[in-house]
Amino acid sequence: MDTQTLNFNKVHFVTSAPDIRHLPNDGGVEIAFAGRSNAGKSSALNTLTKHKNLARTSKTPGRTQLINLFELEPGKRLVDLPGYGYAQVPLEMKLKWQKSLAEYLQRRESLKGLVILMDIRHPLKDTDMNMLEWSSHRELPVMLLLTKADKLSPGPRNNQVIKVRQAIADLGPQIQVEAFSSLNNIGVEKLAQTLSGWYLAGADEIADNDEQEQVEE
């Protein structure tokens, strides 16, 4: 049975936080967007939610320094994580972002899925592979979006998707690879369907855990 697609344009901003200690309670289901600072993360969030300015886009990569939290409905949240891998920021600031990102990924129990974005022309950089390997170790479902797919014609685009799928095949079946373009709406519906399924699965997992705790009591 097909999962009903959530209405992502009902999303609203909740808070921005420098680290997990400033986030709301760690309950419900969160799906986080992560990627290098020039991967088109903010544009993807804006396109998914049909909110032009939900996530701020900037011509200067590395401007997203905070964990930004948005809520679709009670218990279902989207998270815009700080961009990683941009060289032209002070080392102290870069280390602070890395610590904030690592803490969220390792300790946030409500994190149930991760969308990792990469420029289709330059995928699988070292920092991208670190994210994928960590996700595989945690057995977290991942949707790898190869962004700016409009920059390639259909043949090379499909070849690049196949090449990336083959390159990460050893990391496990929980990583889904798709072409994506905010400009041409390539892959937007598939993204919405996948995330809707993750929210449903996450909510079911929480319900099962609550049931188990009641039985044990």
Swiss-Prot record:
EngB-type G domain segment(s): 27-201
Needed co-factor(s): Mg(2+)
Chain residues that bind Mg(2+): S42, T64
Coiled coil: none
InterPro entries according to UniProt: G_ENGB_dom, GTP-bd, GTP-bd_ribosome_bio_YsxC, P-loop_NTPase
Keywords on record: Cell cycle, Cell division, GTP-binding, Magnesium, Metal-binding, Nucleotide-binding, Septation
Recorded GO CC terms: cytosol
Binding sites annotated in the UniProt record for GTP: 35-42, 62-66, 80-83, 147-150, 180-182
One annotated GO molecular function: GTP binding
Gene3D superfamilies on file: P-loop containing nucleotide triphosphate hydrolases
One of the GO biological process terms: division septum assembly
Biological role stated in the UniProt entry: Necessary for normal cell division and for the maintenance of normal septation.
Protein family (similarity comment): Belongs to the TRAFAC class TrmE-Era-EngA-EngB-Septin-like GTPase superfamily. EngB GTPase family.
Name of the molecule in the record: Probable GTP-binding protein EngB
Organism encoding this protein: Aeromonas salmonicida (strain A449)
